[in-house]
Structure formats: structure tokens, C-alpha cells
């Protein structure tokens, strides 16, 4: 049996992308929790360029970057396909995955900005949500009825965004404004591939509230 290890952070949407893919494929693996402030020698050796999680180690060989890891898992292991078989549908899935990946920083940074910069960040998030709302019209998931590659890539907006909103006390996703996205998010959270492997919401909420408070405290500290 091939040896599979996953290095990750429990609170990281990127680590959970890989966990979901492994579980969809039915791959047995060893999960190794990393310490953000004291990264292991295994992590630093496995990802010397970026020094970050997730890292998948398969038969001693490290693969890094969550979306690259997803494709590796899909191509390497037997089980249900994650990417569509049709070349055109596969290209679309990759397009939406990249779109979502490119917007991650904007979503996260919005909650750590203030004043005019935060308002600009919100507008960027609203534009992203408009695009997604249009794409998800009359769809259960990005590829139709099947949970797949683009949905895995969307986990930050599918689950973590709601935690950010609650932790920061500011709602960006309103069902009357983004009805298709809101319906997709409800399906998403209730999907078995997702809800069986989510981090505890209360612990995640406490973690990010502490992060938000630390940022606020650092801004108000005397220079």
C-alpha cells in the first residue's frame, strides 16, 4: 500500500481541500498537524520554496499547492473522478477553480482592512459574488448535480466566509442579493463530502476572532 501523508493546519481551507479529495477517492492517509509558529523540519524540507501547507507526501515524494495536489490525487488514485471526464467540462472546472483561487486574498484581506481600503475590498468581494451568483443559476454545484473540482476550490467562500462574517460582525452575503450563491452555499454545507470533514465551527470562529482582535490591537498600539 502506498504511503500517503498530509501536512496541514486544522483551520486552513487549503488543507481541507486536499482532505476532501483524498476522502472522495477513498485514500487512506496520515494527517500531520503543523504548528504555524514552529513549522516542522519535514514541512520545511518538503516545501522549501513556500514553506507552507498543505503538502501531500506520496511514497516519500512531496507535492505542494492545494490545486496542484487535487489534480495529482485525481490522476494518481482510483475512485470517483474529481475533474470531469469531458475535456471542455474539465477546462471549465479549471477556469472556475482558478477564478476562485485568485479571489482568496481579496476575501480574506477585506476583513483585516479598515476605512476606505476595507470598502474597496468589499466592492471586490461583491463583484466576485455577482459573477458566482450568475454562474450558479439553476445549478446545484458548479458542474451541475455533482460535487467536484470547482466546488472543492470554492471552500473558502462556501464555508470559511460565513465564519469570517460572524467573527467580524459584518454580513457580505445576503440571500436577497445573491440568491443563487446562497442556495449553492446551503447545498454545499449540507453535502456529505463537506460536512463530515469540516473543522468545528465554534473553534474556527474563536480562532479567527482572536486573529481579528490581534490585528485591531496592533493597529491601536503606540508606534
Swiss-Prot record:
Keywords: Auxin signaling pathway, Transferase. Residues 2-81 form the GST N-terminal domain. The keyword S-adenosyl-L-methionine does not apply. The keyword Transferase applies. GO terms for cellular component: cytoplasm. It is an enzyme of class 2 (transferase). SUPFAM superfamilies: GST C-terminal domain-like, Thioredoxin-like. Residues 86-212 form the GST C-terminal domain. InterPro entries: Glutathione-S-Trfase_C-like, Glutathione-S-Trfase_C_sf, Glutathione_S-Trfase, Glutathione_S-Trfase_N, GST_C, GST_C_Tau, Omega/Tau-like, Thioredoxin-like_sf. Induction: By auxin. It holds the Pfam family GST_C. PROSITE patterns: GST_CTER, GST_NTER. GO terms for biological process: auxin-activated signaling pathway; glutathione metabolic process. GO terms for molecular function: glutathione transferase activity. It catalyses: RX + glutathione = an S-substituted glutathione + a halide anion + H(+). Root tip-specific expression. Its EC number is 2.5.1.18. Glutathione binds at residues 12, 39, 53, 65-66. Belongs to the GST superfamily. HSP26 family. This is Probable glutathione S-transferase. It comes from Nicotiana tabacum.
Amino acid at each position: 500500500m502506498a504511503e500517503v501523508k498530509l501536512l496541514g493546519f486544522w483551520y486552513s481551507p487549503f488543507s481541507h481541500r486536499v482532505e476532501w479529495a483524498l476522502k472522495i477517492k477513498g485514500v487512506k492517509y496520515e494527517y500531520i498537524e503543523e504548528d504555524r509558529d514552529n513549522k516542522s523540519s519535514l514541512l520545511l524540507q518538503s516545501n522549501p520554496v513556500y514553506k507552507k501547507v498543505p503538502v501531500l507526501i506520496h511514497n516519500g515524494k512531496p507535492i505542494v499547492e492545494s490545486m496542484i495536489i487535487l489534480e495529482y490525487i485525481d490522476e494518481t488514485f482510483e475512485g470517483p473522478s474529481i475533474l470531469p471526464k469531458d475535456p471542455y467540462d474539465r477546462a471549465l472546472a479549471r477556469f472556475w477553480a482558478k477564478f476562485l483561487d485568485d479571489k482568496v486574498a481579496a476575501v480574506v484581506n477585506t476583513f483585516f482592512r479598515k476605512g476606505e481600503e476595507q470598502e474597496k475590498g468589499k466592492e471586490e468581494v461583491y463583484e466576485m459574488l455577482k459573477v458566482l451568483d450568475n454562474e450558479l443559476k439553476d445549478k446545484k454545484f458548479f458542474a451541475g448535480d455533482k460535487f467536484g473540482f470547482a466546488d472543492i476550490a470554492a471552500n473558502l467562500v462556501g464555508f470559511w466566509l460565513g465564519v469570517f462574517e460572524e467573527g467580524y460582525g459584518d454580513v457580505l452575503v445576503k440571500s436577497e442579493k445573491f440568491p443563487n450563491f446562497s442556495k449553492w452555499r446551503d447545498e454545499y454545507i449540507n453535502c456529505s463530502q463537506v460536512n463530515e470533514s469540516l473543522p468545528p465551527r465554534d473553534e474556527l470562529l474563536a480562532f479567527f476572532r482572536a486573529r481579528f482582535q490581534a490585528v485591531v490591537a496592533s493597529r491601536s498600539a503606540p508606534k
